Amino acid sequence: PYLKESTFTGGHGSFEIPDYNGFRLPFGKATLRRKGIQPDNVFCCTLTGDSMEERIADGAAIAVDTGDNAIKDGKIYAFRHDDLFRVKYLSRLPGGRVKIKSHNEAVYPEEEASLEGIQVIGRVFWWSVLD
């Protein structure tokens, strides 16, 4: 499903709550399965903010695989952090910590947080925007 009224932010976080409206993006189920993604684990929404630019533009549609929520260093994840919905690169650190990194590092410095304070929703595996 495409959660049209929902946004994740690449900036400092968003309080938007998912609300499915029936709209779907054209991912073929067979294509997703070939990539090891179960179609029932996928949702799409909009990313707002410039912290992931040049990689993912403000306003891009993103696809999230909720079945892939174990952190693999350097991958992009949708996650909840202190009740904010965010999209960033995540990497595990020693001592039960996680590194939170934006693509636009000049504006958004790297952060660290406790793994306990992070709820990984899923890995962002696709994005698209028309400019």
Regions found by a protein language model. Give the residues of each.
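SH3/SH3-like beta-barrel fold
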Residues: F79, I100-S102
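Short, conserved beta-turn/loop elements at beta-strand boundaries and strand-helix junctions
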Residues: R92-R97, V129-D131
